[in-house]
Amino acid sequence: HNLLYTLLCISFFADQEIDETEKEVIFNSYNKFIDGVTDQSFNIDFGMTTTKFIDLKSESARQAYYDYSLLAIKEDKEFKHKDLVKVINAYVDIANADDFIHEKEVTLIQHAINIWDLKLNINKPKSGKKLEIER
């Protein structure tokens, strides 16, 4: 559930909530990378991942587990370079879902880019603009 944990972090760390639009984007993103996801299996996985997030209690523990999850994804043979770029796109989609880009979202996404050694960059856009990947 490392992928789902990172998707959840992008959404939750910024404003301490996950609205329905963000949850739908998380589902669609997760579904692209994990075969056979149903609404029911997603809700089970999402519940377990949310519980893990809550159980970690502190932001520093949650951040440490985010780092751990990013490294686990990087080392997973299932994820090739192009897949990691697609995951970054999924993070950007989540950040854009609620029409407000939080600094924390930008920081978390840039952190993933750095850990995965991708030649990408993102910058917090001007008010009212969408977050975009710069190559």
Regions found by a protein language model. Name each.
Residues 1-135:
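Small-residue-enriched hydrophobic alpha-helices in membranes
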